[in-house]
Amino acid sequence: MDLRFSEEVRRALEAGQPLVALETSVVAQGLPYPDNLAAARACEEAIRRAGAVPAATAIIDGQLCVGLEEPEMRRLAEGKERLLKVASRDFAVAMATRATGGTTVSATCEMAAAAGIRVFSTGGIGGVHRGASEHFDISQDIAALARFPVAVVCAGAKSVLDLPKTMELLETAGVPVIGVGTDELPSFYSRGSGIPLEHRADDVDTAARIARARFESLKQGGVLYTVPPPEETSLPRNEVELHIAATLADADRQGIRGKAVTPFLLSEMAKRTGGKTLKANLALLTNNARFAGQLAVAYARAS
């Protein structure tokens, strides 16, 4: 894979420093400006404070970029041009048309693996959408998690999804799901989902050993680490479900499908909750980035 590295990321790779990949769909499509830019900066700062180097991924004028300069991140955040939401399947088109866009979980997993970066932080992964038995809307993220040796840190799957079916598909794909200090799957805005987890890691060193065993010893694909969102900004699950049901009904009436569902959901949920979901999203992004930075350092130390 032909990647363009920022100078900071290139130096970190050459020096063997721990790195954490970041997706940018949340910047280009997921959050409003200027909250999206503030979130990107906060995540990068959390990673640096943990002792690792942030490596945001994006497609800039057809180039697959690992590590962004400030003007490039601002370009994605301001959205003054048409920005693609780039998943793995979209690489060829984005490159050939010299497009610019934010990367999803699947795209970031592939780019991180190609760059030799073993840890990636995001808000929540994609998965099986509600009503998938009718429209078969299933994210590429799960296939990427199964394929690429990257430790993905998240607050569970996005709330809009069918969480039980997403967990079943992760199991079918052979992706281990690890609860970080929890026995229950977090559900993005909420600390719980009612879905028990089989595996748990109570400290970063244990989490790092699991990743190293999977990547180095077994030569297998990714690991999913689920971190409960901060308690002070999390929302009750039943409250979130009521808003999701109403928002999805609105999306259906408006004919919103596929990639457009999640940005619509995030925007409408923020309106319905008076900004509570936006606050929760910003907090969990930074919280995940902090743990990912610690995990990257522990992974490097274990080597």
Curated annotation (Swiss-Prot):
Where, in this chain's numbering, is Mn(2+) bound? 137
Report the EC number(s), separated by commas if there are several. Answer: 4.2.1.70
The active-site annotation reads 23, 158
Cross-referenced Gene3D superfamilies, in alphabetical order? Indigoidine synthase domain
* Name used for this protein in its record: Pseudouridine-5'-phosphate glycosidase
Give the cofactor note.
Binds 1 Mn(2+) ion per subunit.
Q: Which terms are listed as keywords in the entry?
A: Glycosidase, Hydrolase, Lyase, Manganese, Metal-binding
Q: Which GO terms describe its biological process?
A: nucleobase catabolic process
The protein's job, in short, is: Catalyzes the reversible cleavage of pseudouridine 5'-phosphate (PsiMP) to ribose 5-phosphate and uracil. Functions biologically in the cleavage direction, as part of a pseudouridine degradation pathway.
Organism whose genome encodes this protein:
Myxococcus xanthus (strain DK1622)
Query: Its family?
Result: Belongs to the pseudouridine-5'-phosphate glycosidase family.
Q: From which residue to which does any coiled coil extend?
A: none
